[in-house]
Regions:
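Conserved ABC ATPase "signature" region
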Residues: 107-126
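Helix-to-loop junction immediately C-terminal to a conserved catalytic motif
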Residues: 48
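Catalytic Walker B motif of ABC-type/P-loop ATPase nucleotide-binding domains
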Residues: 154-158
Length: 334
C-alpha cells in the first residue's frame, strides 16, 4: 500500500530517519516501537504524505506520488496524532467534517457518523464541545472521526496515551472490526510494548533512525552472551517492566505489567518459565494497593502490585523469600 525507498530525512544537519526500505502492505497491522524522540511521529507523517523526505521516495500503491496524485492519496490515508485537534462545534460536527469533504451528505453521512460513534463508544459525547471533553475522550473522538471518513490506511500516534482500559479495548475492537470488514491497514507508533502486542502482527523497533525487526537484543538494548544457558536481563519500556530470559532453546521475553504478576511466599516448586524466585527488596505503598519491589535471585528487579492485606498476610518485608508468577499471556517467545 505505502512504501518508503532509500529514505533519509533530516532536520537541519541531524538525520532523524535512515530507511533503505520499508513497506506497509494492504491490510497489515504494523507497530513501530521506540523511545520518545526516536522519530516515530516523523515516520508517520511521511507515511501520511504530510511531509516529503529529504532524500528518497514515498510510493503509494507502487507509484511515486506528486502533484494532484498527492491529494488523491492523502484522502485515503488518515493520521491521528498524539494530541489531536478538534474543530469548533460538537463531537457530531467533528465526525461529520471529513465526510462532507468527501461529498457524503444526508442520510449516508448520518449513518456513518452514528456507526463510528457507536464503535468508539462516543455516542454520549455527540452533543458536547471540545471544552467538555477529557484528553482521553478527545483521542477517542479523533479516531472515530478518522474511521467515519472510511480511510484505507489509518496511522495512529500513541493511541492509548490518554485512554483508560475500557477506551483501549473499545479502540482495539473497532480497529479489528474495520480490518475484518473492509481490510483497513493500520500502523501505530508507541513506546508502550503492550500496545504493540495488542494491536499488531508485525513489530518494528525504531532507534538511531533505523527500523529493525523485534528481537530481545535490539528491543531492550541488552547484550546476551552466545553461550548463555540461563539468565535474566532487565529493562523497562514505558510503564512496563521487562525480563529477558535466556535458555538453551532460545529467548523468552516477559512483557509484564505489574498487575500481571502474582507474588507468593511459597518456595519455588517448579522450573516453569513463568516463575522466578527472589527476595523482597522494598515495599512502596501506593493507594489503593502496595507496590512491592522484588529482586529475583538471578538479578532482575520487577514490580508487582498487591493489596495491603497481601502485604500483611505474606509478611512482605525486605529480605522475605518470594516467588513471582507471571500470567501465561504475558510470556512472549521469540
Amino acid at each position: 500500500m505505502i512504501e518508503l525507498r532509500d529514505v533519509r530525512h533530516r532536520y537541519g544537519r541531524r538525520v532523524v530517519l535512515d530507511l533503505p526500505a520499508f513497506a506497509l502492505p494492504a491490510g497489515a497491522r504494523v507497530a513501530i516501537v521506540g523511545h520518545n524522540g526516536a522519530g516515530k511521529s516523523t515516520l508517520l507523517r511521511l507515511l501520511a504524505l504530510l511531509e516529503a523526505p529529504t532524500e528518497g521516495a514515498v510510493l503509494f500503491e507502487g507509484h511515486a506520488v506528486a502533484g494532484r496524485a498527492i491529494g488523491r492519496a492523502r484522502r485515503r490515508v488518515t493520521l491521528v496524532e498524539q494530541r489531536p485537534i478538534l474543530l469548533r462545534g460538537t463531537v457530531r460536527d467533528n465526525l461529520a467534517y471529513g465526510l462532507a469533504a468527501r461529498g457524503v451528505r444526508g442520510a449516508a453521512r448520518e449513518r456513518a457518523v452514528a456507526g463510528a460513534a457507536e464503535r468508539l463508544g462516543v455516542v454520549p459525547l455527540l452533543g458536547r464541545g471540545r471544552a467538555e471533553l477529557s484528553d482521553g475522550e478527545v483521542q477517542r473522538v479523533a479516531v472515530a472521526r478518522a474511521l467515519a471518513a472510511g480511510p484505507d490506511v489509518l496511522l495512529l500516534d500513541e493511541p492509548a496515551s490518554s485512554a483508560d482500559r475500557a477506551a483501549v479495548l473499545a479502540l482495539h475492537d473497532a480497529l479489528e472490526r474495520e480490518r475484518a470488514e473492509r481490510g483497513l491497514t493500520v500502523c501505530l507508533a508507541s513506546h508502550q510494548l503492550e500496545d504493540a502486542y495488542r494491536w499488531s502482527d508485525d513489530i518494528r523497533t525504531l532507534a538511531d533512525g533505523r527500523l529493525s525487526p523485534v528481537t530481545p537484543e535490539n528491543l531492550f538494548r541488552v547484550s546476551l552472551p552466545a553461550d548463555a544457558t540461563e539468565g535474566v536481563k532487565h529493562a523497562r519500556v514505558g510503564r512496563t517492566e521487562i525480563a529477558v530470559l535466556t535458555d538453551r532453546t532460545g529467548h523468552a521475553i516477559l512483557a509484564v505489567p505489574p498487575t500481571d504478576i502474582l507474588v507468593s511466599a511459597a518456595p519455588l516448586a517448579t522450573s516453569a518459565r513463568n516463575q522466578l524466585s527472589g527476595h523482597v527488596a522494598r515495599v512502596a505503598r501506593i493507594r489503593p494497593g502496595a507496590g512491592v519491589h522484588v529482586t529475583a535471585d538471578v538479578g532482575v528487579e520487577l514490580t508487582a502490585m498487591v493489596t495491603e492485606e497481601a502485604v500483611r498476610e505474606l509478611a512482605l518485608v525486605p529480605g522475605r523469600p518470594v516467588v513471582y508468577t507471571f500470567k501465561a499471556s504475558a510470556v512472549r517467545v521469540f
